[in-house]
Regions:
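Metabolite-binding pocket within alpha/beta catalytic cores that recognizes anionic/polar moieties
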Residues: 1-139
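Short active-site-adjacent structural elements
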Residues: 165-166, 191-193, 210-217
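His/Asp/Glu-rich mid-to-C-terminal helical/loop segments that flank catalytic regions of hydrolases
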Residues: 213-257
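Active-site rim beta-loop-alpha module in soluble metabolic enzymes
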Residues: 128-178
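A C-terminal functional module that forms or caps the active site or interfaces directly
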Residues: 181-210
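Flexible, glycine/charged-enriched surface loops at secondary-structure junctions
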Residues: 46-50, 150-155, 245-257
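Generic non-transmembrane alpha-helical segments
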Residues: 140-148, 193, 237-245
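Non-catalytic positions within long, well-ordered alpha-helices that form the structural scaffold/packing
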Residues: 83-84, 176, 195
């Protein structure tokens, strides 16, 4: 019978156009092609995987970035495929909707946990298992955000499979009752599949809209403004954190699973 290792070692290059040995020890994950382009421009490195489902770039210091696409199914796929190269740490640079007044547009959220509303993660671990980041990785990322003078927010993220829900009053009321600080489509899946696969993981989420407010739903114009004003800092902090963690951070995988 073919093993999971055999599958992922064959599929990681197929999905990304990148050979296993070309990935760095630390990985940035994103949903957006412009993050990969900005990374490649900054480090003068080649973008691989054009024409593939996922695109990557890796700098000379051993930091890789991967655009894995949108949604929990893609999040689970990349966290499975990354077992082929066994990274030391993975940091998700995602966007999400702010569900509380304190989660204003342009704020960064460091999620302490995620509610598993997407369903995908149920194929990996029972519903009773909480979706959590790796503490030591998040602790170091927190220090990095403070270095950049960012007054970040922390709290619980609700992860859903629904992209078009803003019109649904019943769903909106459910979100309010859960007291989550934000909503996205990937974080819970990344945390659970990372835990199942013994991969250290974390996330910095950029608040890109406030969908519970009357005029807060993301539009093309709003997304363009958020991208122009906040994305460079988002990427910069991710690069800084995952570049420095080997030398400055505590060992992030010193414990046994």
């Amino acid at each position: 019978m073919i093993s999971k290792t055999e599958i992922t070692r064959d599929w990681l290059p197929r999905y990304t156009g990148t050979q296993i040995e070309e990935f760095g020890n630390y990985i940035l994950l994103t949903n957006f092609s412009n993050y990969v382009s900005k990374f490649a421009d900054r480090f003068d490195c080649k973008i691989k995987g054009k024409g593939c489902p996922m695109q990557t770039a890796t700098n000379d210091s051993g930091l890789s970035i991967i655009n894995f696409g949108m949604g929990s199914a893609n999040a689970a796929t990349i966290m499975d495929l990354l077992t082929a190269c066994n990274p030391k740490g993975v940091l998700f640079l995602g966007k999400g909707g702010g569900l509380k007044q304190s989660a204003e547009i342009g704020r960064y959220i460091l999620p302490i946990a995620a509610i598993r509303g997407e369903g995908t993660s149920n194929d990996y671990l029972p519903p009773e298992v909480p979706a959590l980041p790796s503490f030591k990785l998040h602790k170091f990322v927190s220090d990095t955000l403070l270095e950049y003078g960012q007054e970040y927010r922390t709290g619980v993220i609700y992860t859903t499979n629904r992209r078009v829900w803003e019109w649904d009053e019943k769903f909106r009321n459910k979100l309010i009752s859960l007291s989550a600080i934000g909503i996205d489509m990937e974080t819970a899946t990344l945390f659970i599949v990372g835990h199942a696969n013994k991969i250290s993981r974390g996330a910095i989420l950029l608040v890109s809209d406030q969908p519970l407010l009357p005029d807060g739903v993301k539009t093309q114009e709003l997304d363009k403004k958020v991208t122009g004003k906040f994305v460079d800092m988002h990427l910069e902090m991710g690069i800084k954190a995952m570049s420095d963690i080997d030398g400055k951070g505590e060992e992030i995988k010193h414990f046994g699973y």
